[in-house]
């Protein structure tokens, strides 16, 4: 569908390969195998009247989409599959607060209606120190397993503006997702910052990885 964005998934070799003694570092619908999944993320909706994202796999096929009709500070975002079915819903927890925070809910699409559980599966909070100009920190956000978990499961560090981020599983101190500037192999072709790679390790849900990208975009764009 998108041949100009087609690429091969990068395999895991050497020190990046998951150890057999390590526990699974993800949640739901995890990929199985020894290769990373590399998705191309395009910060553009397929609908003319919307802002959003288009996510493409290594074969150039549409995998995820986000169509946002609210052009300024949306309170809610929905990650959909290629057919427009809701997968994950992200809801801003408070409208007025110093710390930007979101709940991530599993969405069940029933007869065209999206049903949302009462409690979020995941909770993401922007690092408060990022709002203090005198303090430098490479940690962008913290990800918790639910809104009542006091200890974060993941940290996100790096620079979203430069499209250079890592999502690290805290208990294992292991990078499970990377956001990278898209590598160009064809001479004369250059992608802007709105097109980048999302590299997801086996054992981590690609849908959750994309949901975290959406929230980074809300917090740091």
UniProtKB/Swiss-Prot annotation:
It comes from the Eukaryota. Pfam families: LOR. Residues 1-20 are annotated as: Disordered. Disulfide bonds: none annotated. InterPro entries: LOR, LOR_sf, Tubby-like_C. Belongs to the LOR family. Might be related to the phospholipid scramblase and tubby-like superfamily of membrane tethered transcription factors. This is Protein LURP-one-related 17. It comes from Arabidopsis thaliana (Mouse-ear cress).
